[in-house]
């Protein structure tokens, strides 16, 4: 297929058109008074969302060059969501503002490479200031405030997440599911999660969620590889008689053994699944022992003189349920005795106190969280499926933002932190580098401008008032239309969200500004179908009878 090559300003202007269209669709969702976006689906009912990344992912433009620009910024939104869980709209609005301002300067003759260098230096300085402005999340109230802001000012969701985090701790596992009723619920169940997924997608029991869900399974723990099926046969025969599911956790399962397990699963002979044991070396042995204590089972270990053939049902652990996706396994309500679990927890605490290695301490704390923390399940309720999906997206966002806040701390929200950080930086740059830094500094006003515009206020007046406020915690509460102390009003953002949004926005905008040529496919028009009207209904074929 023929390709079209476009250079310099013409190429950048086309890319900008795509970025602008994406930004126009995403920016309307920003702030407490942001609007919804209705998205047509190829099948089923349309979805309604106020989630920036959900909107960005749906934007596909007809013009291939414009679509290239839009797709780069779409990637920024996705990456920001993956890294920080929120801030996708902020990243998109910042990327657009930086690209727009940069384009004007480069068209006027500024050197793109020097401009990029200045932008990077300004970004680095602002990130450093944001870290200085941040402070730790102190209590449950602040956790609820962060979650509420990220869930589009839904206090009920904010309080649910704060309750969940209080019950399982900041290192605990919190999952989000759909409720069977219209009410939101929080269930906390004892459980353990580790980062190993199913060994074969053929084990999946829930095709919609792509997960394996086992109810009241037996759990076989083995510390070596399983390659030969005959070693497994005795215990499999015992399991088949009980009719219960089986989860095998081993160093690996390969070849004939895995193939036979898959065949038995597909034929319905056994409800079975298998995952690799978590960790490596001595840490793997310790984690297998943790799982054994939690589930009331034994680790079948050749070092202890046990072979897989000698395993019986009495050696197997049990749990009320096990959920496995492609990356993680969660064991819920292990059948282990509480006294044994408490003894193991105390043993790990003693090891944490004794160790001098930061890495070992971190891994021991992970094991402690898995053993002592439970699994919190937030069940989201709604009246319709469309509302359910929109609400579940908001809860997922709020949960990620809350974890980010606990991890790196909080700053004042509503776009004010970026403006306060801008006021504090002092860069000594010359020429086009200074222009690059000024572009980023001017763009930092964009999130607050957009929040004010969406709420129906004069953006210029709002930005000016926040910039000139004497108290560094003063910002604009768009929901009430007032200038307030953002910390006291609970309008706060995780510093990680602001930091990641800015870094990603500067990265993609500088990439677009230093683009000098674009290569895209030329869409060829398909030839029209030939005119069939002259055939006269094939009347001339009547003589063939």
Swiss-Prot record:
Its main location: cytoplasm. GO terms for cellular component: cytoplasm. It catalyses: ATP + H2O + a folded polypeptide = ADP + phosphate + an unfolded polypeptide. It is found in: Cytoplasm. It is an enzyme of class 5 (isomerase). It holds the Pfam family Cpn60_TCP1. It comes from the Bacteria. One of its GO terms (molecular function) is unfolded protein binding. Its EC number is 5.6.1.7. Keywords: ATP-binding, Chaperone, Cytoplasm, Isomerase, Nucleotide-binding. ATP binds at residues 29-32, 50, 86-90, 414, 477-479, 493. One of its GO terms (biological process) is protein refolding. Belongs to the chaperonin (HSP60) family. NCBIfam families: GroEL, PRK00013.1, PRK12849.1, PRK12850.1, PRK12851.1. Forms a cylinder of 14 subunits composed of two heptameric rings stacked back-to-back. Interacts with the co-chaperonin GroES. Together with its co-chaperonin GroES, plays an essential role in assisting protein folding. The GroEL-GroES system forms a nano-cage that allows encapsulation of the non-native substrate proteins and provides a physical environment optimized to promote and accelerate protein folding. This is Chaperonin GroEL. It comes from Campylobacter jejuni subsp. jejuni serotype O:6 (strain 81116 / NCTC 11828). The gene is groEL.
């Amino acid at each position: 297929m023929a390709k079209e090559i476009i250079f310099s300003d013409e190429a950048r202007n086309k890319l900008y058109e795509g970025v602008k269209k994406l930004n126009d669709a995403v920016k309307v969702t920003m702030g407490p008074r942001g609007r919804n976006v209705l998205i047509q689906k190829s099948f089923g009912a349309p979805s309604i969302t106020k989630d920036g990344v959900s909107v960005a992912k749906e934007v596909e433009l007809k013009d291939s060059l414009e679509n290239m620009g839009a797709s780069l910024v779409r990637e920024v939104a996705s990456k920001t969501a993956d890294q920080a869980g929120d801030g996708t709209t902020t990243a998109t609005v910042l990327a657009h503002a930086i690209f727009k301002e940069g384009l004007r300067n480069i068209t006027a003759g500024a050197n793109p490479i020097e401009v990029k260098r200045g932008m990077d230096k300004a970004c680095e300085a602002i990130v450093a200031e944001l870290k200085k402005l941040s402070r730790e999340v102190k209590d449950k109230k602040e956790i609820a405030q962060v979650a509420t802001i990220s869930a589009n000012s839904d206090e009920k969701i904010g309080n649910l997440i704060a309750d969940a985090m209080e019950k399982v701790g900041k290192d605990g596992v919190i999952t989000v599911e759909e409720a069977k009723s219209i009410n939101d619920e929080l269930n906390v169940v004892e459980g353990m999660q580790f980062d190993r997924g199913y060994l074969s997608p053929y084990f999946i029991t829930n095709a919609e969620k792509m997960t394996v869900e086992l109810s009241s399974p037996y759990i076989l723990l083995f510390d070596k590889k399983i390659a030969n099926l005959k070693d497994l046969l005795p215990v499999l025969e015992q399991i088949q008689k009980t009719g219960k599911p089986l989860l095998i956790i081993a160093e690996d399962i390969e070849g004939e053994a895995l193939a036979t397990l898959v065949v038995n699963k597909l034929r319905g002979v056994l409800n079975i699944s298998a995952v690799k044991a978590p960790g490596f070396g001595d840490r793997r042995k310790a984690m297998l022992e943790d799982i054994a204590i939690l589930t009331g089972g034994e680790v079948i270990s050749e070092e202890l003189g046990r072979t897989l053939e000698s395993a019986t049902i009495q050696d197997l652990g049990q749990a009320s349920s096990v959920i496995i996706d492609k990356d993680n396994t969660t064991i819920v309500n292990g059948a282990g005795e509480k006294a044994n679990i408490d003894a193991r927890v105390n043993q790990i605490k003693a090891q944490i106190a004794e160790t001098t290695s930061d890495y070992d301490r971190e891994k021991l704390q992970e094991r402690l969280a898995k053993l002592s923390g439970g699994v919190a399940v937030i069940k989201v309720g709604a009246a319709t499926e469309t509302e359910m999906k929109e609400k579940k997206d908001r809860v997922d966002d709020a949960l990620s933002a809350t974890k980010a806040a606990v991890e790196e701390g909080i700053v004042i929200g509503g776009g004010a932190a970026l403006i306060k950080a801008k006021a504090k930086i002092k860069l000594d740059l010359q020429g086009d580098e200074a222009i690059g830094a000024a572009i980023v500094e001017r763009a930092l006003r964009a999130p607050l401008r957009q929040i004010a515009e969406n709420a129906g206020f004069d953006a210029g007046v709002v930005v000016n008032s926040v910039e000139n406020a004497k108290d560094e915690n003063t910002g604009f509460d768009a929901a009430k239309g007032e200038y307030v102390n953002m910390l006291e009003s609970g309008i706060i953002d995780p510093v990680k969200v602001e930091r990641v949004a800015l870094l990603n926005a500067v990265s993609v905008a500088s990439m677009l500004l230093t683009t000098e040529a674009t290569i895209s496919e030329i869409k060829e028009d398909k030839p029209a179908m030939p005119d069939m009207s002259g055939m006269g209904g094939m009347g001339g074929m009547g003589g063939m009878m």
